[in-house]
Every structure is written in structure tokens, then in C-alpha cells.
Amino acid sequence: MEYNRQPCPIRIVEDCGCAFMMGTIGGSLFEFLKGFRNAPTGLQRRLYGGIDLVKMRTPSIAGSFAVWGATFSTVDCALVHYRQREDAWNSILSGAATGGILAARNGIRAMANSALVGCLVLAMIEGAGAAVATINAADKGAGIVIKPQRAQWEAILETIDPKRASSTQDFALAEFERVLDKCRASREPNLLQDIPVKSHERDSKQKPFYSLLDLVKLSQMF
């Protein structure tokens, strides 16, 4: 599931606006360069030629992008509502449906070709996104060494008063041991009630065992 996108009703407006901006920026740049190149000689004429072509062609390009984005998001939201899930298949099917819908005025063959192109393009985009996500996850997970964390106030106390820092650490260990003792005291009677009196398991339960704090002390982590 994609958590960085808006919910479905708002997603249509968002994708339509983003597609319109992409068409405006990309179309303006492309048409300006095209008009600048095809204009007569002279810098001023070339600039005017590029600007005139931008004013004539960019609105239609931006509108086409907006229609494509709105249609794609509408089909995507319909698939999400029908399938009750969000995955790559929704995008692939939405791309195919969008291509077919926008080419419906040109006949069945044009619809099939546009649907195939949209399906292939969205499949490549989803595959590239999945590959990048897998590579990033592998890079982030490699070579990570987990170090024991310390409380922030311990580092501050060490710089101010080392003796107070050690006493604070001992107090924390004592509190931790006290909590463990309470847990053991409340847990052992409940366990022994379910075991028969003359049972080897009951004898083994009554034997002393090391607590978590004892194991930490034996490992000399502190």
C-alpha cells in the first residue's frame, strides 16, 4: 500500500493537477526550443517565435496530460474499491484502461494498441520502482551494527559529574532488579498451582534461576 498518496476521492484531483503541471512545464520547454529553432534568423525573432509557439501549443499539451491523469486516477480508484487492495496490478490495469478510453474515438484497433502501450509503460514503471525499492532496502539493511543504547541523561551526567552518573546507573539497575523480583513473585505461584505436588517439573520450577539482570551483569555490558 502506498502511504504517501492521498485517499481516492482527493487522489483524482491531485493527479490531475500534477499531470497538468508536468504538461505545462515540459510542453513549454519543448515548444519554446522548437519555436526558437524554427524561427527566422536573429535572436529577437527566435525568442518571439519560441514564445508564440509556447502560447499556442502548451495549453493543449497541458490539457491532454490533465485528462490522462484524471482518467488514470479514476480507473485506479475504481479498481481499489472493487479489489479492496492497492498493488502494482491496479496501476498496470489503469494504464491499459486509460489508453483504451482515450483512443476510443479512433476505433477498436487504435484502442487495443493504446491499451497495450499503456499497459507496457505502467508495467515498466512499476517494475523499476520495485527494483529501486528492493535495492534501497538491501543497502540499508547491510552492514548495520546494533549498539546498546543509553539514556540521554547518563551522557550529560558523565560530562558534569562522573560519580553521580555511576550512582544513577546503579539506581536504575536496582530498580530494574526490583521490578523483576515482583514479576517473579507474582508469576511463580501461578505456575506452581498447575503442576502436581509430587512432580519432577515442580522441583525444577522451584530451583533458583538467573534473572535477566544477572545475565546482563555476567556479560559485563555495564
Curated annotation (Swiss-Prot):
TM stretches of this protein: 16-36, 60-80, 115-135
A biological process term (GO) from this entry: protein import into mitochondrial matrix
Signal peptide: none
Keywords assigned: Membrane, Mitochondrion, Mitochondrion inner membrane, Protein transport, Translocation, Transmembrane, Transmembrane helix, Transport
Compartments, record wording: Mitochondrion inner membrane
Subunit composition and interactions: Component of the TIM23 complex at least composed of Tim23, Tim17 (Tim17a1, Tim17a2 or Tim17b1) and a Tim50. The complex interacts with the Tim44 component of the PAM complex.
Protein's recorded name: Probable mitochondrial import inner membrane translocase subunit Tim17 3
Annotated organism of origin: Drosophila melanogaster
